Amino acid sequence: LAEPYSHGLSSLANEDCFREEVMRMSDKIKQMFGKAPKVFRNSSLIYSDEIGAQVAAMGFKGMLTEGAKYILGWKSPHYVYHCNQAPSLKLLLRDYKLSDDIGLRFSNSEWSEYPLFADKYINWIDALPQEEQVINIFMELSALGMVQPLSSNILEFLKALPYCAKEKG
């Protein structure tokens, strides 16, 4: 998963600078892991069709972006969409509610769903319409240890998710 090297806003200001930042990060990932990233995530999940076209021109196959209700309206974030200006670029939309339930609300004892356990979370996903099979959960790394203190058992929750998903089928 590539992103601008500085995690800045170059995608909004300067196309050349944006390309340089993305290529710098992509090169670093390839150097460290031996594989070039194929999916892109812009700083703060910023997206426009113009940015999508630039990302596709850099060779990326997909892009992770925000699936906010005010943007989607009646549409669901649980499908793969495509960039209007570069139809080969697949758009993976973050499910903001499911993501924020972990990233922001997990340890909030005043939250109506507190405490949140992995089996309960997987049941929420399982209750989604059967045709909605693409669920993108994404949060900032700061959610682990900063927003959600390690004492909240956030790591144990995350470790239990794959097991609970497998048990659910």
Describe the predicted segments one by one:
Residues 89-108, 136-145:
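Active-site clefts of carbohydrate-active enzymes
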Residues 1-38, 45-100, 115-132, 149-168:
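Catalytic alpha-helical scaffold of carbohydrate-active enzymes acting on polysaccharides/glycoconjugates
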Residues 39-42, 137-139:
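Extended hydrophobic secondary-structure segments that form protein cores and membrane-embedded regions
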